[in-house]
Amino acid sequence: MLADIHTPVGIYLRLRDRFRDTVLLEGADGHASDNSCSFICVNAVAGAEVRTYDTLEVKLPGEKPETVKIEDGRRVPELLWSFLKRFTAEGDVREASFAQAFYGYTSYDAVRFAEPSRLGGRREAMIPLMRYRLYQYVIAINHFRDELFLCENHIEGLPSESDLLLSLIRSRDVPQYPFALTGAETSDMADADYLRIVDRGIAHCRRGDVFQVVISRSFRQGFTGDEFNVYRTLRSINPSPYLFYFDYGDYRIMGSSPESQLIVRDGRATVHPIAGTFRRTGDDETDRREAD
């Protein structure tokens, strides 16, 4: 269907109160023919989750979660791949592949599963280290062509509610809730300590130990109301081609990025470090030439 009167944010707001585990991934670069899609994933039916450094939880459609003990962290990619291979998909239409995928995240601390020597002692995980879900529905919006696709995974024993989704997509009602800050902002590190770490990072770059380093610290802020307003503000003050908002019930993850960090296409994985970005012009040919 045509998508010129629909927005990913509007659709997400209409669906999230009616369907559990709804997540949003936005491709906001509507001037580019590639990677100009947004996705709203609705109703998780299966998935895998590394809850702690020692525990992997997997779930199949219609079954109770199964816990797998992680004996060797280096086998986590193998365990996840083994789980993914338990699924088969039919159909060769390109748009169908939007639904035939697992959506989720891999946290920074999960790097120890690939390279255990990279990190020191374990930090307490506030959220699962990795979480990926297969969804019954994926709404895909191609901003370049103004097309909207409602993709559904037909799973035995799982009733379809696609008609309800379509009615909500077409609805004019967009529920919104207030948001307010409470208390003062706090950080886990004083300004002076943070600046000392920045100086160390600069020194490492000058010595040639690294060509890029990201220095960060955590902030905390109390609030009341709907966290989605924070995401809406983020996409307004920091508009980026790639944005995401994952609402998992007991925690939320949101963010924006100027570049796709990893692209997998035709069996090849390509990494795009942030240090290699370039100014976008809006012209595909010029942008492609600058990237090369």
Model features per residue range: what roles?
Residues 1-292:
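Extended alpha-helical targeting/anchoring segments
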